[in-house]
């Protein structure tokens, strides 16, 4: 047989298996080298990783490469994302203990020790081929773990460049470079499956197919749910402030974020004023014919058209066939009555923002529920309002992990310097979204905890204390 002859499929699979096993062996060897590292040493390593992406020339280079590779998003915003998410995550991590004693007694008689979860397999998306790998790697290595990244095939080149920078950063601080590795090109589904089956923890960000595969791998897994964020503009909202925040959030990186607004629910008594405020900041109000054009071209055979998603507004307008003036817009408003069967009720990954009119706040809440039932349940919703009772009602009634109040959703949902959420690029959506976590992915998900338990003064209440109210009402029979 000549050297150019095709190999049997089984031979290719065996080769992939051997390559994955070799990566895992190197990862475990690297972990052994830092097994005795104290918190200061771990923090030094994490800081080096952060600088590898935060460094201005690196943030720009990887942003340019990401857009070149994937055709998704825009360079200026990816630079911001690369730096902001990395800086915010570093802030969070530098304030946490993860190795050795991480919590001491507090009167409970329990001392907690942080320990690694092991080798982490990280599934990363094409939407963030630099920021997400670094974000997950920082969290994983904060727990003294090693990580192997399985990138989206479309983003492999930029993710590989990111990994090379991280490995160089590790070498600079004399840490084992195999703490961070990447699946070799070309990444196949089989290779990713083998990785998920052999690591100690899988963390999957990206398509729901990837998330389901992670949960089906037989390995402990953390996945994230689908986005499709609905945001209410309330009757007493500051309309100009809301419009500015929606503009900043919706247009950031051309709506690649799962936290980008996908629908607005505007109260009837401020509907036209809110539309006017949105138009002042650059929204384009599509007419019926234009809405039909978008419906026909944004989806191809039921799937989002990759030629139009996450594109600049002028590219989108030309691709859809909108009026020439639409090319000057920042984003596009599509107004319609709610229809669960309409594609506009789904996540659109584009500068298209669906707008619904609500009769009153009760109707607005109902619409948010119905939108999330189509897609995005568990993820998040938002509201612009001066009535603090309304966001409380959303928190009580809507099955989401996050309800954001008067915020640019893309910037607040994954952590911000002016809210209490930790920085992340992976949003857990609870069981509502088919996930194992109902919070932002964070360093705590990358450590095991040993509890050293000593005795304390007995804390045993009487039967009367625990059953008294029940006995008084129902007796002891």
Task: Give the label of every model feature segment.
Residues 2-111, 139, 280:
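N-terminal Rossmann-like NAD(P)+-binding subdomain of aldehyde/semialdehyde dehydrogenases
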Residues 4-7, 35, 322-323, 327-477:
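Conserved C-terminal structural/oligomerization subdomain of aldehyde/semialdehyde dehydrogenase
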Residues 6-8, 14, 134, 142, ...:
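ALDH superfamily catalytic-core signature
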Residues 23-25, 223-225, 253-258, 342-349, ...:
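Short, flexible turn/loop "capping" segments at secondary-structure junctions
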Residues 24-31, 35-38, 46-57, 66, ...:
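Structural signal for hydrophobic packing residues in well-ordered secondary-structure cores
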Residues 36-41, 63, 174-179, 252-258, ...:
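Flexible, glycine/charged-enriched surface loops at secondary-structure junctions
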Residues 98-241:
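Rossmann-like NAD(P) dinucleotide-binding subdomain of oxidoreductase/dehydrogenase enzymes
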Residues 195-198, 238, 298-306, 417-424:
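Short, surface-exposed amphipathic charged segments that create phosphate/polyanion-binding patches used
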């Amino acid at each position: 047989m000549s050297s150019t002859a095709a190999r049997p499929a089984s031979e290719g699979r065996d080769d992939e298996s051997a390559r994955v096993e070799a990566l895992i062996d190197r990862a475990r060897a690297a972990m052994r080298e830092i097994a005795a590292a104290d918190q200061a040493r771990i923090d030094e390593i994490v800081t080096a990783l952060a600088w590898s992406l935060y460094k201005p020339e690196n943030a720009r280079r990887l942003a340019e490469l990401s857009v070149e590779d994937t055709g998704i998003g825009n360079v200026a915003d990816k630079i911001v994302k690369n730096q902001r998410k990395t800086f915010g995550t570093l802030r969070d991590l530098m304030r946490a203990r993860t190795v050795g004693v991480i919590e001491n007694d507090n009167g409970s008689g329990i001392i907690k020790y942080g320990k690694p979860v092991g080798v982490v397999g990280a599934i990363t998306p094409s939407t963030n081929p630099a920021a997400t790998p670094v974000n997950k790697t920082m969290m994983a290595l904060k727990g003294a773990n090693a990580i192997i990244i399985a990138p989206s095939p479309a983003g492999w080149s930029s993710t590989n460049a990111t990994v090379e920078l991280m490995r160089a950063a590790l070498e600079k601080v004399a840490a084992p470079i195999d703490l961070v590795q990447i699946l070799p090109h070309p990444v196949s589904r089989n290779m990713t499956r083998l990785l998920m089956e052999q690591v100690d923890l899988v963390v999957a960000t990206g398509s729901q197919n990837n998330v389901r595969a992670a949960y089906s791998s037989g390995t402990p897994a953390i996945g994230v749910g689908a986005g499709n964020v609905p945001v209410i503009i309330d009757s007493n909202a500051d309309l100009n402030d809301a419009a500015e925040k929606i503009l900043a959030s919706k247009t950031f990186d051309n709506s690649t974020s799962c936290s980008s607004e996908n629908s607005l629910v505007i109260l009837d008594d401020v509907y036209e004023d809110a539309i006017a405020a949105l138009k002042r900041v650059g929204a384009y109000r599509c007419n019926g014919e234009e809405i039909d054009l978008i419906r026909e071209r944004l989806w191809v055979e039921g799937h989002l058209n990759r030629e139009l998603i996450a594109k600049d507004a002028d590219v989108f307008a030309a691709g859809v066939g909108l009026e020439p003036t639409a090319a000057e817009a920042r984003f596009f408003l599509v107004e319609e009555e709610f229809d669960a069967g309409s594609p506009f009720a789904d996540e659109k990954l584009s500068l298209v923002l669906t707008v619904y009119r609500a009769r009153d706040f009760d109707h607005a809440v109902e619409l948010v529920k119905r939108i999330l039932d189509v897609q995005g349940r568990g993820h998040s919703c938002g509201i612009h309002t001066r009535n603090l009772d309304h966001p409380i009602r959303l928190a009580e009634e809507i099955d989401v992990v996050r309800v954001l109040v008067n915020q640019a959703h893309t910037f607040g949902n994954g952590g911000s310097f002016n809210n209490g959420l930790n920085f992340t690029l992976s949003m857990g959506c609870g069981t509502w979204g088919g996930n194992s976590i109902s919070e932002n992915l964070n360093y705590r998900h990358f450590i095991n905890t040993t509890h050293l338990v000593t005795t304390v003064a007995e804390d045993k209440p009487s039967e009367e204390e625990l059953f008294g109210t029940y006995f008084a009402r129902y007796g002891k029979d």
